[in-house]
Amino acid sequence: RQALSVLEQEGLIEKRQGSGSYITGRSRGEDRIDLLLSSDSAYLYPMLLHDIKKTLAAQGFSTTVHITENTFSTEHTLLQKILHQPPRALLVEGVKTARTNPNLDLYRKLQKKKCPVLFLQESYPELTNCPCVTMDDFGGGILLTRHLLATGHTRIGAIFPADMRSGLLRCQGMLHALRDTGALPEDSLICWYFSNDPDYGIQKAMQKLISSCTAIVCYNDTIAYALCRAVSDLPQPPEITVASFDHSYLCHFGHTEFLSLTPAEAPGSRAAGVLLHQLQGILVSSTEIPWKL
């Protein structure tokens, strides 16, 4: 107790009624926590932001949201700006995480300024000392594919982003489940697109898979919804099961309906909780949130 009292007098920690002591650091960045996200408008983000802000605000922290648009150049500009006035902590959704990132040095500079960095959903494996809260995408790929196999599907295709680690992991999980049954798909049934130019790749994938598969695994609900619409617009729509991840309102929007996995826990709330532990000086480790049917 005496040691905590000394640290509080020196401004290195602060006590908050009902929630313990928090590290302030020499440059507190006031009580601001910055969020670096790829978007704030796609279907996932309103609830994600709500959960993060609600959890942090309950402990007296404000949030500033920066949007990278999933581009390295915008991420670079924003990190340079953040470095000039570091926040208490930084919560980041990584950019094109399956590619080499040119901005890793800026994250390391932030860490040297005693700014904790936590990754959410998409992380950079090179930053081994930065914990992350991600979905168990490998396990999700297995779960979804095993469900499709159990319902009698043998020709299963997929549409994934080639530049996002979550897309690669979902694909790996799918292939793992198929391999266990000896039902590996033809290479042409696994289709890829790039996240900053999705329309071209996704449209080509749809045209190919609709005529070749009985079930199609989509990276997210946006693609799944577009696929369902494309199938229903055909003169003679084939019977295709569409499966996805996220379980958003798009699963039951209008006359469209498809299967989509649900996070077992709200990612935003979990990430904000982990970040608060970091600010309290508690050692945290990376964690994966499972998917459920």
PLM regions and their residue ranges:
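Short, solvent-exposed amphipathic alpha-helices that sit
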Residues: 43-58, 140-143, 165-185, 226, ...
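Short, well-ordered beta-strand segments
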Residues: 34-36, 157, 217, 243
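Helix N-cap/beta->alpha junction signal
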Residues: 137, 167, 219-221
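N-terminal helix-turn-helix DNA-binding module of bacterial transcription factors
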Residues: 1-30
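Alpha-helical recognition/docking segments in bacterial nutrient-uptake
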Residues: 24, 28-146, 206-211, 215
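Short beta-strand elements in bilobed, periplasmic/extracellular small-molecule ligand-binding domains
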Residues: 56-68, 156-158, 175-200
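An alpha-beta-alpha
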Residues: 142-182, 285-293
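Flexible loop/turn connectors
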Residues: 186, 203-293
